[in-house]
Amino acid sequence: MKDFIIGVNYWASHAGTNMWRNWNEEVVRADISFLSENNIKTLRVFPIWPDSQPIKPYYTSGALYEYRMEDDSLPKNPYYLDETMLARFEKFLDICGEFGVEVIVGLVTGWMSGRLFVPTPLLDKNVYTDATSLMFQEKFVRGFVCRFKHRSEIKSWDLGNECNCMMSFPSRAVAYSWTALITNTIKSVDSTRDVVSGMDGLSINGSWNIFDQAELLDVFTTHPYPYWAEYGSVDRLMSIRTLLLATAVNKFYIDVGGKPSLVEELGTMGPQVCSEENAADFANVNLFSTWANGAEGMMWWCSFDQKHLKFPPYSWKKCEVELGMAEADYTAKPVLKTFKKFGDFLNNSKIDLPKAKEDAVVILTRETEQRAIGWMAYVLAKMAGANLKFCYCEKEIPKSDIYLLPSISGPDVMPQEKLDDLVERVYNGATLYISADCGMLPEFAKLTGVKNLDFDRSNKGGSFMLEGKNINYSRNCKHYIEICGAEAICQNEEEIIFTKFGFGKGTVYYLNYPLEKNFMNKSNAFDGDDYLIYKQIFANKESIVNARNKYLGVTVHPTENGAITVIINYSGECHSCDITLNDEYIIEEVICGDINTIKPFESTVIKLKKII
């Protein structure tokens, strides 16, 4: 059975980032005992770089003579690692072993909670390009991994905490080279463990490039805090849009990057953002949602509150000090109880959850904000009862019965050879959905059954009716179109909005405005009925389970004799578990939750048996 990681980012309750220099074995043992009792069995830990490698330069006649340790002694190993700190980390692992806790080790911890942690002699050097800094990073990583690779408590090696935050963004080449140096150094010493990213903020076109990182790393990580994520706070924390952020971003990494991905940091940013009760509900939805949608696990930030710590970063960053699962005196917050309950569910049910069935492929195109548009499409699809797989238009497009091209923009939508392949698949029977944001496709009328008459960049919107519901729309550019073979599904007095066209054996849906782009920065957008557009696209998809409520997200996980189905309430209201089953299946067992009513932010897990 594949284990789903249930964990936390750990700093000792008494000292925070000073835990290694202010070591207290008794407190650390009490911390880990407390966390373990609450089903927290994985800790991400951070050997602070300048504490572990306290180097000091010595000069003669204006030139560097040698490096020693900070206390003026000669190094006791070729890596300039402090033996006292190494012994403390060894003892830390001993304690973890006592309680059956595994550890993800963040190696180059030069950044933490807004503070730079770099050895003093290296502070004026670029950590990504300076030869001296790179030498000491390589020595640190090599020495640390050599020292502890035999320890069974270590689950994986993490590059370090958000290493892409240590300095301003380098070029793509520099980001690649730095990642390769650290990863290859780890692998040269220990090839038995995964190397995980430790970073968020990877993108298709940026310096920290998702394809480069996929080439070098074994596991991606996401840190999808709504408070910090772009467009993450447009809606309330407890809205379906925000509740699906972590799931969508993690799925984006898995599908586009082609590697497993761990939700390595998640949290609410404390009681000034939401109540502790809401934080627990937020965690509960995300535990079930990330588990059901293919994540390696989910880890909270962080273990204990740090209000009592009066040094940087805690004296700087007021948002950092109330993020714990518990108070420093071991008073458990509701979120810790949520993690314990979810751990009990996994331990008792012993579910080996297969991969969820995917209903469509969303092709992310050039000249768009791919991650944000993908997220919007993901939420709309969930509300319409479908689950998406992401891909990027320059890479191989997975086989599917349904494809989405959301909010296409600009003259360079996608490579022509990829478009030709897609068009052929549609002609042979697939369904294609296109929404327009001034994107240009050749032979557009032939593909869509819609002819463009004119175009302008004026902001012209309006409303239309679909399934008896009024839907508002807007755009920053307008295509004036007429039908040349398509069927108009939706139109108003002024224009045609939504069309359907038989293309060969397939079907093409065209939406004459950028629904997904519009939603990126629009508050409460998902409260409306716009998801009905997606419901049209998925009307004929084959499903084992269908939910009639837009706030109930369903994943179906086929098994040898049936399926496991996870039904998640992404809302703050009770909803009837209003589902329909394919005639070939019956409910064999309710594993978790209530089959009649799903409470706010709760989930129901059922086992289905195939009878035909």
What are these regions (language model features)?
Residues 202-203, 380-398:
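A short, well-structured beta->alpha microelement
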